[in-house]
């Protein structure tokens, strides 16, 4: 997606705004801030749907005793092939989630508290959270259990609750009317409804809409297509000559990660092989995007979101990266 397409998808499709950024009073969707936060989290991390949609509050540093800033958390059970890696969440994405947690999530949690209390025997009731070690301890089916958060599969995350302001509430960041984590069908429904709104409100100011509706995975592609050329230009300088750029790209396949944008982004995405990430370079060669401005104001209102991501990626890459 381009910048304009992403903002249209997030703000008009998911967020209930009109194309001119005014409130859409005919909007009949639920929890627009949830959709916006989900989109910002997906784009800001480059993670797969199963990774960002199942994230828990402690993983983003949200909750009593947690530090609030940019966050890092480890995925394993919800990652593709169970491959362990570290996901970095920039401050703007955290801010977007904070807005949702402040304005919408409490009402959903309050409405579902009694229902969850009746079902507590079927839920994993978390009693202690170790933010430093990334572990939780609680009761499931009458048995005391302890888990590394990264090792918790999606079905366990969905039934994880803790004692909140209104009683039992989900430990998941994103919740629906039932009080627990939305499933794949729910997120698909949110996306389809967003597409219908985007098409219905399209006018001459609307950015180009593709023939097929966007998928959540397209935000992951956008992350790669923005971050990869940004790192390339930052580390190796701009190269307008197409043939030279292609030679440089081929050299990335065997280069050292410390000086290699391809391998840094490959690790960020959790690709099993740099060859998979290499495909993105074919798209960057046409220079469609204005890379100098590409990373400004994509997520929140700040100016450093993707520059922050790039700086963190370079820092991690220089030290060998996260967990491969």
Regions found by a protein language model. Give the residues of each.
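Basic, Lys/Arg- and aromatic-enriched nucleic-acid-binding interface segment
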Residues: 11-49, 259
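Flexible interdomain linker/hinge and immediately adjacent N-terminus
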Residues: 1-18, 78, 177
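Short, basic (Lys/Arg/His-rich) helix/loop patches that form interaction surfaces
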Residues: 192-267
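Conserved tyrosine-mediated DNA breakage-rejoining catalytic core shared by Y-recombinases
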Residues: 54-169
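A short, glycine-centered helix-capping/turn motif at helix boundaries
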Residues: 41-54, 230-235, 258-259, 269-272
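Short, structured motif recognition centered on aromatic/hydrophobic residues
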Residues: 9, 41-42, 52, 96-103, ...
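C-terminal secondary-structure termini that scaffold catalytic or DNA-interacting sites
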Residues: 275-278, 290-324
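Short functional hotspots where side chains directly engage DNA or cofactors
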Residues: 65, 73-76, 215, 241-284, ...
């Amino acid at each position: 997606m381009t910048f304009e397409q992403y903002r249209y998808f997030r703000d008009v499709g998911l967020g209930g705004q009109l194309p001119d950024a005014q409130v859409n009073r005919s909007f009949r969707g639920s929890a627009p801030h949830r959709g916006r936060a989900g989109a910002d989290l997906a784009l800001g991390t480059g993670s797969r749907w199963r990774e960002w949609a199942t994230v828990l509050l402690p993983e983003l540093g949200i909750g009593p005793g947690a530090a609030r800033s940019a966050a890092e958390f480890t995925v394993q059970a919800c990652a593709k092939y169970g491959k362990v890696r570290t996901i970095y969440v920039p401050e703007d994405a955290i801010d977007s989630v904070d807005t949702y947690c402040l304005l919408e999530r409490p009402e959903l949690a309050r409405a579902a508290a009694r229902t969850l209390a009746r079902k507590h025997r079927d839920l994993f009731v978390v009693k202690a959270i170790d933010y430093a070690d990334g572990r939780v301890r609680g009761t499931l089916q009458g048995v005391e259990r302890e888990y590394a958060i990264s090792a918790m599969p999606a079905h366990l995350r969905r039934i994880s609750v803790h004692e909140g302001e209104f009683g039992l509430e989900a430990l998941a960041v994103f919740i629906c009317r039932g009080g627990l984590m939305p499933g794949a069908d729910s997120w698909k429904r949110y996306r389809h409804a967003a597409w219908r709104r985007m098409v219905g409100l399209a006018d001459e100011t609307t950015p180009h809409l593709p023939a097929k509706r966007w998928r959540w995975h397209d935000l992951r592609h956008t992350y790669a297509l923005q971050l990869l050329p940004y790192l390339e230009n930052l580390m190796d300088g701009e190269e307008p000559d197409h043939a030279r750029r292609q030679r440089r790209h081929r050299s990335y396949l065997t280069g050292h990660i410390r000086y290699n944008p391809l391998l840094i982004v490959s690790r960020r995405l959790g690709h099993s092989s740099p060859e998979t990430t290499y495909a993105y370079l074919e798209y960057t060669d046409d220079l469609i995007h204005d890379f100098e401005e590409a990373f400004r104001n994509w997520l929140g209102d700040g100016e450093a979101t993707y520059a922050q991501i790039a700086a963190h990626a370079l820092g991690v890459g220089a030290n060998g990266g996260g967990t491969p």
